[in-house]
């Protein structure tokens, strides 16, 4: 029932409620029957305490405006339609105090200069997983850590990551995304088709939709057009498959190797060609997948390894079976065969089945150490290169994955929202050894490419160093 007119005119009011916070007071004329029936706090008060017979009650609250708005809502009066972060937290505190249903708001963004206020409000709410996440997500880079309890700092540090991600969406817009702060920021209005991160100079190499190549220095945030040709040496320590970035020496290599393979096979046809090339991390070897189609036999696939130093080309595999996902590992290569549904390792001129009966292998990658990761349509498999065995399997649906550390990966999965054809993306982090999700969030865009880059603000490292220094001081004293 709408009691808006009754409230505004003050008709039949039987209680003056005086709300008081630290700086303000506000008097409103209300009706005990409405408070009693709608708000459990007043139900208890009017049933069991002397206030049930009082014409005036003074009530200390966190914020007089917020509590007044809550009470007015039971009269059918709509109030703050665009609440800021502080209002939302004070509303949560007030609803909880009044014993009404409430949910702590997620993903609030607090200005750096208001972090002290956030601390005060969290102190009232109490420390729990959600409020500590809130503090971690909003901790200013230059905040004086000595003002915070060491136990709280440990909890905050455990929630930080030493990386963030760069994203290109399906509309070719580029974003930076922080998994800790859960903050998605469009970097520029320019559109891009592809990108790679080079750790040596802390640069993103970007191919724009106008075919031009740009570099963005992540330390200085300076974006400039790259006039010179991109060299393969720029991709040092990268597992490079297909790329939209034009690399002249790459194209020249393809043409040269294609001619050599055709000569090797004694066949030159318009129905053949290189389908993919993959570079070893040190750029000394190149894997080449070559396909030849013949009407009577269908598609035939070869896998060649080219040694850059000796200029020798070696055939290592041939089959009437599509080959993909070639990956260089310390003592050989790993690849996937589609019809036989096998992941195969080639090392010391010998073949070994790594995993069999795997449908739809999307990606094979590894941490440049021991852990090999095989991503299929419904799970990822962790394979130990040293022990030559599967150490874990995790059921999940991901489109693409990237290693963040030796144990942590980040992946994403695109999905349609229920009531529209809009595609959103779920970003998830996993500990590959335990199989546990360590973080996840949905973003309102369709991800086309995701690249992990280091956090140059070093927030996690700064927290860790400060905690260690305090612990050392305590031991010394």
Curated annotation (Swiss-Prot):
Domain BTB stretches: 13-83
Pfam families in UniProt: BTB (PF00651)
InterPro entries: BTB/POZ_dom (IPR000210), SKP1/BTB/POZ_sf (IPR011333)
Name this polypeptide is given: Putative BTB/POZ domain-containing protein R830
Family (UniProt): Belongs to the mimivirus BTB/WD family.
Source taxon at top rank: Viruses
Gene3D superfamilies recorded: Potassium Channel Kv1.1, Chain A
Taxonomic source organism: Acanthamoeba polyphaga mimivirus (APMV)
């Amino acid at each position: 029932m709408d009691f808006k007119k009754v409230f505004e005119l003050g008709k039949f009011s039987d209680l003056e409620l005086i709300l008081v916070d630290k700086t303000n007071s506000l008097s409103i004329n209300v009706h005990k029957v409405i408070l009693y029936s709608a708000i459990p706090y007043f139900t208890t008060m009017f049933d069991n305490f002397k206030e049930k017979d009082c014409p005036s009650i003074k009530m200390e609250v966190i914020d007089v405006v917020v509590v007044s708005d809550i009470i007015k809502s039971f009269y059918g009066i709509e109030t703050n339609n665009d609440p800021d972060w502080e209002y939302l937290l004070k509303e949560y505190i007030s609803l909880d105090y009044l014993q009404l249903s409430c949910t702590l708001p997620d993903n609030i963004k607090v200005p750096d200069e208001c972090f002290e206020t956030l601390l005060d409000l969290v102190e009232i709410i109490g420390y729990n997983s959600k409020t500590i996440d809130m503090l971690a997500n909003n901790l200013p880079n230059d905040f004086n850590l000595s003002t915070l309890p060491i136990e709280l700092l440990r909890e905050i540090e455990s929630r930080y990551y030493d990386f963030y991600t760069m994203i290109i969406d399906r509309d070719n817009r580029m974003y930076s995304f922080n998994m800790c702060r859960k903050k998605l920021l469009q970097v520029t209005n320019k559109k891009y088709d592809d990108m790679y991160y080079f750790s040596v100079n802390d640069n993103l190499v970007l191919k724009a939709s106008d075919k031009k190549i740009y570099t963005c220095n992540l330390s200085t945030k300076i974006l400039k057009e790259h006039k010179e040709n991109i060299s393969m040496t720029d991709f040092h320590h990268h597992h490079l498959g297909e790329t939209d970035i034009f690399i002249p020496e790459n194209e020249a290599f393809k043409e040269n190797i294609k001619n050599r393979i055709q000569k090797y096979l004694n066949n030159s046809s318009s129905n053949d060609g290189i389908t993919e090339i993959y570079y070893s991390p040190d750029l000394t070897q190149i894997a080449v997948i070559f396909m030849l189609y013949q009407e009577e036999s269908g598609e035939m696939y070869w896998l060649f390894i080219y040694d850059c130093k000796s200029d020798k080309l070696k055939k290592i595999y041939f089959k009437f079976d599509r080959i993909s996902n070639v990956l260089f590992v310390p003592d050989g290569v790993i690849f996937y065969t589609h019809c036989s549904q096998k992941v195969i390792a080639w090392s010391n001129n010998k073949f070994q089945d790594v995993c069999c009966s795997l449908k739809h292998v999307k990606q094979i990658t590894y941490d440049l150490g021991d852990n090999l990761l095989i991503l299929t349509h419904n799970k990822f498999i962790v394979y130990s290169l040293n022990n030559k065995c599967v150490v874990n399997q995790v059921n999940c649906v991901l489109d693409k994955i990237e290693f963040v550390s030796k144990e942590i990966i980040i992946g994403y999965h695109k999905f349609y929202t229920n009531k529209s054809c809009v595609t959103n993306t779920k970003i998830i982090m996993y500990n590959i050894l335990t199989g546990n999700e360590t973080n996840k969030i949905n973003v309102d865009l369709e991800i086309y490419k995701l690249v992990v880059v280091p956090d140059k603000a070093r927030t996690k490292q700064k927290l860790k160093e400060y905690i260690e220094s305090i612990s050392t001081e305590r031991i010394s004293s």
